[in-house]
């Protein structure tokens, strides 16, 4: 895994190229990511750096986490994230990582938590077809129908597509293009859409696929 950044989704807009082509982009605000811990094979069994970003009131931080931040001499952030990298020892606790690790034209992967839709039926959740609107059908227009067989096997198989909770899952969008890097304002402009609601945290890393 490569070094990445934790940012916050600001929403979508569009920018125009010099020849008038409109490009839809998602704006990701990247506040300074502070290194809170260096993990190595000798001490933790793997190499990684732990980072935090944002701000959290000290009154909302429990004592163990307050001690963790104090040990790193870093102000409490809104969470902790890790990036598994081979050269973790090249970084120091308290160091800052900003949007300049990316450049325009680079491909990145973006991970986030998809929008929660609550409990949904099979038509919306799994794109099932609806049943007949008329011809003797009553109250079953959007029912998913049979879920299994009869006495054998006498049960519903695991992973059967049925109604249930939709969204609020970890989703990765791969190979999005970095259209622009605004280091002064801490912004990344990524071509296309990314998972999650406005204000949600996203993790941006170099693309694993070219």
From Swiss-Prot:
Q: Family per UniProt? A: Belongs to the universal ribosomal protein uL3 family.
Q: What is this protein called?
A: Large ribosomal subunit protein uL3
Keyword Membrane attributed: no
Write out the GO MF terms.
rRNA binding; structural constituent of ribosome
GO annotations of cellular component type: cytosolic large ribosomal subunit
From the record, give the cysteines joined by S-S bonds. Answer: none
- Cite the InterPro entries for this sequence: Ribosomal_uL3, Ribosomal_uL3_bac/org-type, Ribosomal_uL3_CS, Transl_B-barrel_sf
Q: How does it assemble?
A: Part of the 50S ribosomal subunit. Forms a cluster with proteins L14 and L19.
Which keywords accompany this UniProt record?
A: Methylation, Ribonucleoprotein, Ribosomal protein, RNA-binding, rRNA-binding
Note the superkingdom of the native organism.
Bacteria
Q: Which residues carry this modification: N5-methylglutamine?
A: 151
Protein's job: One of the primary rRNA binding proteins, it binds directly near the 3'-end of the 23S rRNA, where it nucleates assembly of the 50S subunit.
